[in-house]
Amino acid sequence: MDFYLGIDIGTSRVKAVLFDQHFTACASAAENTSPRLSANGYAEQDMTQLWHSVLAILRQIARHPALQAGRLRAIGLAGQGEGVWLSDEQGEPVGPGILWSDTRSHELMSDLLRRPGFNRRYFADTGTHLQPCNTSLQLYWLKHYQPARLAAARYLFFAKDWIRFRLTGVAALELTDASSSLLNQQTGSWSSVVMNEMGLNELLPLFPPLLAPDAPAGTLSDAVAALTGLPAATPVAAGALDVCSAALGCGAVNEGDIYTILGTTCCTGIVCRGPQTVNEATRFVTHTEAGQVISLFPMQAGTPNIDWLQQHISLDADLGRLEQAIAEVEPGSGGVFWQPYLNGERAPFYSPDARAGFFGISPHTTRAELQRAVFEGLAFAIVDALQGYPQGGELYLTGGGAASATWLQIIADCTGRTVVSSAFNELSARGAAILAARSVAALAETPPLAQTRYQPRPQAHARYAALYPVYRLLREQMLPVWQARQAALQPLSQDVQP
C-alpha cells in the first residue's frame, strides 16, 4: 500500500501524520516546541531545536509497522505563517527564527503609516494591512537594526520552507506563504510597494525560487534518511501555509466555503474567487486551489484563552470536567462577557493595546458562568469576523479546539451556522499529505472526510443574536480605554529597574 506523510510545523508543536492511500490516518507523532517570548515584543524560536524536534517525530513515524510493510510515496509540509527564518548556504540558522507573533517592529510600522496613503497602497498591492506580524515589516526591522544578520544569510525562508530545505537540500519558497505580505495578489510577482517603498529590493538575492503548493520540491536526502529511517529519495512537495493547508484538509475548497481553525490563533477564512473586501479588517492569502484566495481573519489569541481559563479560573486541567460545567450554564452566561484579547488583536480589528477581560460580573455570577463566557467570547469573535458575509450555511471547524463538542455547539448557536467537524482534527497535516499526493500525480480529487454536523438551536441563537451587539459595542467603546491604559503604563515601565 502507498502512504503519504503530512508534517505540520506549528508555533508550539510539530506533528507528523501518516496517511494510507485512502487518506485514513495510520500513525502520528508530535513534539512540543518552546517559543521564546519577551516583554519587549520579541517572539522567537530556536531553529536548531525545531529541527531536532522534526527529526524526532520522523523517527517515530519511520518505526511504524504499517510504513515498514508499505511504500512512502511522498511527503508534504504545512507550517505557521509570516515570520523570518534565515539560514546560510548549508541551511544552518543565522539567528533565531522570528515568529508571526513578534511585535518588535511596531514603531517602524507607525513611521510607515505616517506616509500619506501608504497603508492603502500596501493593502492594494499585497492584500494585507501593515502589521508587526508581516514578514515584510520584520525584514524592514532587520534591515534597520540588524543589517549584519541579513548580510550573513544566504536564504530567507518561512518555517516549513526551512524545514523542507533541511530535508531535501533544495531551497525554495512557496506561493501561499509568500502571498501573506510579499507578493502582489493580482500578478503573483513580488510587491512593488514592499520592494521599492520599503526598500527591500536589495534583499531579493535572499529569496529562493517560488513554487506552487503541490509542486515537487526535491527528495529526501541520504543524510536525513540515515537520521530518521525514512526511505531516501522520497519525493517532497512544496506544501502550504497552515491556514491554507487546513482549509484543504477540512474541505473548504469551493467559493463561499467558510472555516475556522480553533488553535493558537482562532483564524476564520472565507474562500473567494478573488480579493473581495467585504470587511475592511480582512487580509487575503492565495489558496492551495488554483484561482482562489482566502479572506482571513486571524485573531491574535485563540485557545490560549482556554489555557488561561484552566490555569487561573477553573484551576483544573481536565477539559472534560470543564465542558460538563459549562454545558449546564444557560446560553449567555448570565450576562457575563469575555473579551478574548490576551495579547492585543489583529482581526477583525487591529489594536496592539487591546486586552482581555470580563464584563458584567455581579454578586451572583458563578465560576461556571465565567468559564462559559470565555468560550462564548471566542464564538462572538467568529461572528464579529463574519459581519457582512451571507448568514446561515455551513462553517467548517478544525484545530485542537474542535475536539470540544460543547464548544462546537456554542459556536453553532452563536453564529447561526451548521458547524461541520471531524473526529480527526489534524487537518493541516492532512492538507499537506494531499498536496504530497498531488505532487506525484497520485490524486485526481480531494478524498472525502467523515464529518459530524452541529445544528444551531433556534432559542439559543436568538439569545446570542440579542447579546452580540453588546459584545461589539463593548470592544468599540474599550478602544480608547485600552489606549489610555497603555499610555499610563509606559512611564511606569520606564521607572522599573532591570
Can you say where each PLM-predicted feature lies in the sequence?
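Conserved small-residue
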Residues: 16-18, 23, 75, 102, ...
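N-terminal glycine/serine-rich phosphate-binding loop of ATP-dependent small-molecule kinases
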Residues: 1-96, 124, 152, 225-226, ...
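Core-facing hydrophobic residues within beta-strands of well-ordered domains
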Residues: 72, 204-207, 392
